[in-house]
Amino acid sequence: MSTLVQCGYFERGQCQSCRHIKLPMVQQLAAKTQELQQLLAPFVVSTNTQFLPPVVGEDSGFRNKAKMVVLGAAHAPVLGIVSPNGEAVSLCDCLLYPADMQALLYRLERFVQQAGIPPYRIDKAKGELKYILLTRSQVRGEYMLRFVLRSPDAIARIERELPALMAEYPQINVVSVNIQPIHMAILEGDEEIFLTENTRLEERFNDVPLFIRPKSFFQTNPHVAAKLYQTAREWVGEFAPKSLWDLFCGVGGFGLHCASKDIPLTGIEIEAEAIACAKMSAQMMGLDNVQFMALDSTDFAKGDAAATKPDLIIVNPPRRGIGESLCDALSEFAPRAILYSSCNPKTLAKDLVHIRGYQLTRVQLFDLFPHSDHFEVLAMLVKDSR
């Protein structure tokens, strides 16, 4: 891992997404560690709380997903962003992407040109192609390619050029069109139209098969994410739980790492596509004592499910955290332990105020987002025996 990444886009002021890229990784990690320790200091009530060393990965070439705004014109498309001064900037060779992904992004610029699809102009409410979303699986280097269109009008042009693209890049496994008709900078709409027989991308973290569908959330740094899931498995394994809940479970990464044929698992996630992926993974793993349901996690916990209290609960909420209502429900369930995976330590700290009767015993930072302010935190809460 190098100590400093050189980015021309940042130097020229064209892209400021990696706001800390001029700092060596050691300094970036020190700042994140200090922030985490300060936020969680009020919850360290004894010397039993361990702050473990941060887990890091590569500082470039680590990202598995590109979200490209389509700019320019049909004869000269640009995949990237609008710079602070209003310039269309191609980010096909962004250093966060692996080399093969960069090459494919450049090829997709040519694809748009060959198809003659006009980029959407939000200021004029004209054009067709809004975004290109590209996701890479590390298993076989396969890709899921999504075109976000204003309407179905340009689908025929995509279908016309697609055979040549897929012959050149046979690792493109899934292709779809998302229809987003609203004249706003919204990433995707409700309608998804598949142009390939395959509708999901296979990934594997450690020994767990996982699946990615167009609208299911998936970690963007697979190397560090695999370590995150493995650490969760080890921490949970120390409790030998008799039953598990995985709330905000997504495609099932945490729960499937921690479940076994002897440990029943209930996974809850509001996104139906993610639940479909989790069910496929459980089937591949031969787990028949697992159930995944497309429900709101808070509604589930406060409903009839309260009658079947789990031995250990995993929560992996979005940036807003789990909220006071779910914190109250977890406190009432009083499981032996709660494993909280957070992508926002500020909301983690807010939630810890409302989770009553638990000690924070172990914390570890996972740097899934180098050069940014963001990071993931794994926190173990153990029922207070006092």
UniProtKB/Swiss-Prot annotation:
Binding of [4Fe-4S] cluster, residues: C7, C15, C18, C94
* Active-site residues per Swiss-Prot or TrEMBL entry: C343
Where do the annotations place S-adenosyl-L-methionine binding?
Q219, F248, E269, N316
Q: Which family does it belong to?
A: Belongs to the class I-like SAM-binding methyltransferase superfamily. RNA M5U methyltransferase family. RlmC subfamily.
Instruction: List, alphabetically, the PROSITE patterns matched.
Output: SAM_MT_RNA_M5U, TRMA_1, TRMA_2
A GO BP entry is:
rRNA base methylation
A Gene Ontology molecular function term of the record: 4 iron, 4 sulfur cluster binding
Instruction: Tell me the Gene3D superfamilies matching this sequence.
Output: 2.40.50.1070, Vaccinia Virus protein VP39
Tell me, what's a Pfam family for it?
tRNA_U5-meth_tr
Its Enzyme Commission number(s) read: 2.1.1.189
Describe its function.
Catalyzes the formation of 5-methyl-uridine at position 747 (m5U747) in 23S rRNA.
* Name of protein: 23S rRNA (uracil(747)-C(5))-methyltransferase RlmC
Q: Which HAMAP family does its entry note?
A: 23SrRNA_methyltr_RlmC
Which InterPro entries does the UniProt entry name for this protein?
23SrRNA_MeTrfase_RlmC, MeTrfase_TrmA_AS, MeTrfase_TrmA_CS, SAM-dependent_MTases_sf, U5_MeTrfase_fam
The UniProt catalytic activity note for this protein reads:
uridine(747) in 23S rRNA + S-adenosyl-L-methionine = 5-methyluridine(747) in 23S rRNA + S-adenosyl-L-homocysteine + H(+)
Q: What class of enzyme is it?
A: transferase
**Key words, A-Z:** 4Fe-4S, Iron, Iron-sulfur, Metal-binding, Methyltransferase, rRNA processing, S-adenosyl-L-methionine, Transferase
User: Which organism's genome codes for this protein?
Assistant: Shewanella oneidensis (strain ATCC 700550 / JCM 31522 / CIP 106686 / LMG 19005 / NCIMB 14063 / MR-1)
